[in-house]
Amino acid sequence: MIEVPCPICQKSVPWINESTFRPFCSKRCQLIDLGEWAAEEKAIPSDTADFAMDPNVSDEWSIK
């Protein structure tokens, strides 16, 4: 059986269907992680993240 560390508390989590919150060990750790994303403490790196700030980018798709 494969075990992975919980991304929040590092507790060992078995990677099986019965592990309801995998890769998290509990609902609490799952919600802590969600809160970090919602508070923008975590982000996926991207070269195009600032496209909205670029005046040269067309916004034809936006509703006016």
Swiss-Prot record:
Family classification: Belongs to the DNA gyrase inhibitor YacG family.
Cofactor: Zn(2+)
InterPro entries to which the protein is assigned, alphabetical: DNA_gyrase_inhibitor_YacG, Znf_NHR/GATA
Subunit structure and binding partners: Interacts with GyrB.
NCBIfam families per the UniProt record, alphabetical: PRK00418.1
Protein name as it appears in the record: DNA gyrase inhibitor YacG
Protein function: Inhibits all the catalytic activities of DNA gyrase by preventing its interaction with DNA. Acts by binding directly to the C-terminal domain of GyrB, which probably disrupts DNA binding by the gyrase.
An example Gene Ontology molecular-function term: zinc ion binding
Residues that coordinate or bind Zn(2+): 6, 9, 25, 29
Keyword Cell division on entry: no
Swiss-Prot/TrEMBL GO biological process terms: regulation of DNA-templated transcription
Species: Haemophilus influenzae (strain ATCC 51907 / DSM 11121 / KW20 / Rd)
